[in-house]
Design a protein with these regions (language model features):
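HIT superfamily nucleotide-processing domains
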Residues: 1-378
Length: 378
């Protein structure tokens, strides 16, 4: 279906309007003026006087605005796999350090009020009525999930680009500076590794980024999500079986990509190419060298991977809805699965043919996608 006109790929977003000054920091719940509408942060990434990025942990509620957070790691208020699930199925409780963090946070008036506010927000969203009649002690029973859950969000500082004047000038991954994007990727990898320590039953931690509402984002504010799960999932199980049966499969795929001229860009540490076999037009970012876990790469290698991904985000642009999906080897699987990232453009709609046949059409072939991306990168 590669000759279908491209007009169907235009995504209709809300008509832009002029920005109000307050909207730079108050456009959605992820913005800086609304820190107290999200759960207590686990950590933040700040830029120091040395121009380097530093992780700050354990900030009390009263200090939330004392320093600029370039990125924040916060629990997801509406978890995919909830704290209660981990507690009931895997005897999960907060660790000693998490209990101390919770006690310290609740010890201040600002922290106490923040936690109660967030708990009430979640209960209200789930249909709970008459919250004013529920005593604080009962509400605080829900606080464990805000400090010891396994679904985190990595939120960027900006909602709109610096100097924006219209509501369609969102700050995307491609509008970050090279240094900011490198920090974003490194910070996400550190959180990914940390979530494997949530509970012995964690089998996999999935990482992804939904950009814009047509791609599944709750807010048009740049963020990644990480979710600890107690199973590998169909994709990982199937890939592990293929790799075990054919350890050379990744090399063969890269050879095929090169032979069929699907490569888009690369550096010493990673390549990006037009991928195939997906429901949406997809670009793959593959690190080069041995198959490693994401946190086993050196800082230089991570930066190289980040640069390839960042260039692709820049080329795609902030107006295109995308899903960024991370794949890696589960820590307890002894199969040489490769870390890689897929960038899927959500500009087509699955319709009646796909639903009735389970045959999925992609109207953009890999070579058209390659040519488009190369032109945009130039």
């Amino acid at each position: 279906r590669g000759k279908r006109p491209h007009s169907h790929r235009r995504v209709l977003l809300d008509r832009p309007r002029l920005l109000l000054p307050s909207e730079f920091t108050n456009a959605c719940a992820f913005c800086a003026d609304r820190y107290f509408d999200t759960p207590p942060e686990k950590s933040r990434l700040v830029k120091g006087l040395d121009s380097k990025f530093h992780i700050i942990e354990g900030l009390p509620a009263a200090s939330m605005h004392d320093m600029v957070a370039e990125f924040r790691r916060i629990p997801n208020l509406f978890e995919i796999v909830s704290y209660d699930y981990w507690h009931e199925n895997h005897n999960h409780y907060p660790t000693e350090s998490q209990n101390r963090r919770m006690a310290d946070y609740l010890a201040s008036a600002e922290g106490y009020d923040h936690v109660l506010h967030v708990v009430k927000m979640r209960l209200e969203a789930s249909g709970e009525n008459h919250l004013e009649t529920i005593p604080d002690d009962a509400l605080l029973q829900y606080a464990n999930g805000l400090f010891a859950g396994g679904h985190d969000v990595i939120v960027a500082r900006r909602h709109y680009v610096d100097g924006a004047t219209r509501t369609d000038q969102n700050a995307s991954a491609g509008t970050l500076s090279v240094a900011e994007h490198r920090a974003y990727i490194g910070y996400t990898i550190a959180a990914l590794k940390d979530l494997y320590n949530l509970n012995p039953a964690v089998k996999y931690v999935t990482a992804f980024q939904n950009w814009l509402k047509p791609a599944g984002a709750s807010f048009d504010h740049l963020h990644k999500q990480l979710v600890a799960v107690d199973e590998y999932g169909v994709q990982i199980e199937a890939e592990a079986a293929r790799v075990a049966a054919n350890p050379a499969i990744y090399r063969q795929i890269l050879h095929y990509v090169g032979h069929r001229q699907m490569m888009i860009l690369g550096n010493d540490y990673a390549v990006g190419f037009a991928d195939f076999g997906h429901r949406y037009q997809t670009i793959a970012v593959w690190p080069l060298g041995p198959a490693l876990l994401p946190w086993e790469y050196t800082r230089e290698q991570v930066d190289g991977i980040s640069d390839v991904l960042h260039a692709l985000h820049c080329a795609v642009g902030p107006a295109v809805p995308t899903n960024e999906e991370w794949y890696h080897r589960p820590v307890d699987l002894d199969v040489p699965m490769r870390f890689r990232i897929l960038l899927k453009q959500r500009t087509s709609t699955l319709a009646g043919f796909e639903g009735s046949t389970r045959i999925y059409l992609n109207s953009v072939d890999p070579w058209t996608l390659r040519d488009e991306m190369v032109e945009l990168l130039e």
